[in-house]
Amino acid sequence: MPVGVPKVFYALPDEEEADWIDLYHCLYQERLIVICGDLNDEAVNQIVSVLIYLSTRDDSKEFFIYINSPGGSVTSGIAIYDAMRFNNTPVNTIAVGISASMASFILAGGDIGKRLAFPHSRIMIHQPEGGSEGQSSEIVHEAQEVVRIRRQVARIYAQRTGQPLDTIARDMDRDQFMSAREAKTYGIVDLVAAEK
């Protein structure tokens, strides 16, 4: 049985009295963004909109993006990455649970020194997937586009991790799972959270 979005008692910055607002609105006001589930167009549009809107209001207050996602559309992941990288607001990324596929790309896209993984989180990189049907010329064109995107994603991973491009390309050939510590060694994250 769905429970809906919980409400919390919260005073907005310009308000004297607190009121009940939905949890996500409260988190956004504190610059906390949670990415969970598939990276589909609807979720990505909301995340990009929040990043843009809040960074235009105050670009000095840091974002904290918590990620627990199996990934999704490569273009959606690139859209979030671009929104994170092309504004002046510092961005912390935190892996909670699973950060796979384009979710690991977003995780790596946080500011260097501000990328964290919880100790039991899992991180996975792999090559972008594509599929097409239709006339052979359309299939060839789509395959060329998938190869172009794969190169783009690999270049960005190499840039963000410090790994050689050929290592990234080889590791993306299949699902490459990593523990939090392995992801730190690889350069996807900078820190692994310590347990209490």
From Swiss-Prot:
- Which leading EC class covers this enzyme? hydrolase
Kindly state one GO CC term assigned in the UniProt record. Answer: chloroplast stroma
Pfam families per the UniProt record, alphabetical? CLP_protease (PF00574)
Q: What is its EC number?
A: 3.4.21.92
List the PROSITE patterns hit by this protein, alphabetically: CLP_PROTEASE_HIS (PS00382)
Q: Which GO terms describe its biological process?
A: protein quality control for misfolded or incompletely synthesized proteins
Name the InterPro entries on file: ClpP (IPR001907), ClpP/crotonase-like_dom_sf (IPR029045), ClpP/TepA (IPR023562), ClpP_His_AS (IPR033135)
Q: Which reaction does it catalyse?
A: Hydrolysis of proteins to small peptides in the presence of ATP and magnesium. alpha-casein is the usual test substrate. In the absence of ATP, only oligopeptides shorter than five residues are hydrolyzed (such as succinyl-Leu-Tyr-|-NHMec, and Leu-Tyr-Leu-|-Tyr-Trp, in which cleavage of the -Tyr-|-Leu- and -Tyr-|-Trp bonds also occurs)
The protein's location, in the record's own words, is: Plastid, Chloroplast stroma
Gene Ontology molecular function, alphabetical: ATP-dependent peptidase activity; ATPase binding; serine-type endopeptidase activity
Q: Name the coiled-coil region(s).
A: none
The disulfides recorded in the entry are: none
By sequence similarity, the record places it as follows: Belongs to the peptidase S14 family.
HAMAP family in the record: ClpP
What is known about what this protein does? Answer: Cleaves peptides in various proteins in a process that requires ATP hydrolysis. Has a chymotrypsin-like activity. Plays a major role in the degradation of misfolded proteins.
Q: How does it assemble?
A: Component of the chloroplastic Clp protease core complex.
Q: What is this protein called?
A: ATP-dependent Clp protease proteolytic subunit
Gene encoding the protein: clpP
